[in-house]
């Protein structure tokens, strides 16, 4: 049986890993074993952070909506509660975009939310009967 020589495949595999690890620091960009370990970790971090990014954007949108809502004398949770009660179906991404790009439209949405809230909710906490 003929001997199988794998030098070409092995070098190709190593070259691919080292090419992908370009930009890493120290041995992790020069030594195959270290580069391979770092690449495995990097892929795991990328997978994790693609999912974490979605939550981070949601936090950003909520912060923007809350800032714009407070400028209109209503809190974020009252705004969302009022919009749901008024059957306004707008997601947080679009609501944040409206708050930044079109303040007049956002103010109109705030008024719709206020009309959707029950009467006792609109009274400030210090003046409740």
UniProtKB/Swiss-Prot annotation:
Protein name: Large ribosomal subunit protein bL20
Task of the protein: Binds directly to 23S ribosomal RNA and is necessary for the in vitro assembly process of the 50S ribosomal subunit. It is not involved in the protein synthesizing functions of that subunit.
Keywords in alphabetical order: Ribonucleoprotein, Ribosomal protein, RNA-binding, rRNA-binding
Alphabetical list of Pfam families matching this protein: Ribosomal_L20 (PF00453)
Gene3D superfamilies associated with the record: 6.10.160.10, Ribosomal protein L20
CDD domains: Ribosomal_L20 (cd07026)
GO biological process: ribosomal large subunit assembly; translation
Gene Ontology molecular function: rRNA binding; structural constituent of ribosome
Ranges that cross the membrane: none
GO CC terms in record: ribonucleoprotein complex; ribosome
NCBIfam families, alphabetized: rplT_bact
Family per similarity comment: Belongs to the bacterial ribosomal protein bL20 family.
């Amino acid at each position: 049986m003929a001997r199988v020589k794998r030098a070409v495949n092995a070098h190709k595999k190593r070259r691919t890993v080292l090419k992908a690890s370009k930009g890493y620091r120290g041995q992790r960009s020069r030594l195959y074993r270290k580069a391979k370990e770092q690449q495995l970790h990097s892929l795991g971090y990328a997978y994790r952070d693609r999912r974490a990014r979605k939550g981070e954007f949601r936090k950003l949108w909520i912060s923007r909506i809350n800032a714009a809502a407070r400028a209109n004398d209503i809190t974020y949770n009252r705004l969302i509660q009022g919009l749901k009660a008024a059957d306004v179906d707008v997601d947080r991404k679009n609501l944040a975009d409206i708050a930044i790009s079109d303040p007049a439209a956002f103010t109109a949405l705030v008024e719709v939310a206020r009309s959707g809230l029950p009467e006792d909710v609109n009274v400030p906490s210090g003046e409740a009967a």
